[in-house]
C-alpha cells in the first residue's frame, strides 16, 4: 500500500469514527429529553416506569385538591374517567388550574404510585390538549359508558 493510500485510509477511518461518536452523543442527548405520555389508567396498570420523568395528563378530579397551609405544596388527583392518579407539586400553580380542568403534569412516579411533579401545565381549551390526553379521556369515557370528559370547561 502506498503512503498516499494509507493516509487516505487513516483519514477515512478517523472521519467514520468521528461521525459515529457524534451520532452516539446525539442519541444519548435525545434519550434524556424524551418524556413519554401516560394516562392515569396506564399509570394505575403499572405501564409507566418508576423514577423516570414522564408526562401524565387528565382532568383534575373534583374535591381532590389539597393545599399545605405553610408552603406551596399541593396534592390533587387527575383522572381519565376510569382511574385516578395522585399528583404532588411544590410550586405556584398556573392561573388556569382548577378542579375539572385538563392538565398535563411532568415529573417522576414514586414507588407508591404518586406522581412527584416538577411542572404543571393547565389547559384552558381542548384544542390545546395533547392528542394523547384527548384520546385517553375519550377512551376512558367509552370504557365507563359516560360522555367524554375532554369537553372544554367554561
UniProtKB/Swiss-Prot annotation:
The protein's name in its UniProt record: Cytochrome c-type biogenesis protein CcmE
Species of origin: Bordetella petrii (strain ATCC BAA-461 / DSM 12804 / CCUG 43448)
Entries under InterPro entries matching the protein: CcmE, CcmE-like_sf, NA-bd_OB-fold
Periplasmic side: 30-154
Transmembrane regions: 9-29
Domain of life: Bacteria
Molecular function in Gene Ontology: heme binding; metal ion binding
A single BP term in Gene Ontology: cytochrome complex assembly
Purpose: Heme chaperone required for the biogenesis of c-type cytochromes. Transiently binds heme delivered by CcmC and transfers the heme to apo-cytochromes in a process facilitated by CcmF and CcmH.
List of residues binding heme: 124, 128
Family the entry assigns: Belongs to the CcmE/CycJ family.
Amino acid at each position: 500500500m502506498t503512503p498516499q493510500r494509507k493516509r487516505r485510509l487513516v483519514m477515512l477511518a478517523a472521519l467514520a469514527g468521528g461521525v459515529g461518536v457524534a451520532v452516539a452523543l446525539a442519541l444519548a442527548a435525545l434519550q434524556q429529553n424524551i418524556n413519554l405520555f401516560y394516562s392515569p389508567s396506564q399509570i394505575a396498570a403499572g405501564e409507566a416506569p418508576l423514577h423516570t420523568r414522564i408526562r401524565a395528563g387528565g382532568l383534575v378530579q373534583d374535591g381532590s385538591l389539597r393545599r399545605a397551609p405553610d408552603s406551596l405544596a399541593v396534592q390533587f388527583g387527575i383522572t381519565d374517567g376510569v382511574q385516578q392518579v395522585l399528583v404532588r407539586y411544590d410550586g405556584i400553580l398556573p392561573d388556569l388550574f382548577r378542579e375539572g380542568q385538563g392538565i398535563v403534569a411532568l415529573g417522576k412516579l414514586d414507588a407508591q404510585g404518586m406522581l412527584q411533579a416538577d411542572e404543571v401545565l393547565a389547559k384552558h381549551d381542548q384544542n390545546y390538549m395533547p392528542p394523547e390526553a384527548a384520546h385517553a379521556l375519550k377512551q376512558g369515557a367509552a370504557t365507563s359508558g359516560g360522555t367524554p370528559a375532554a369537553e372544554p370547561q367554561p
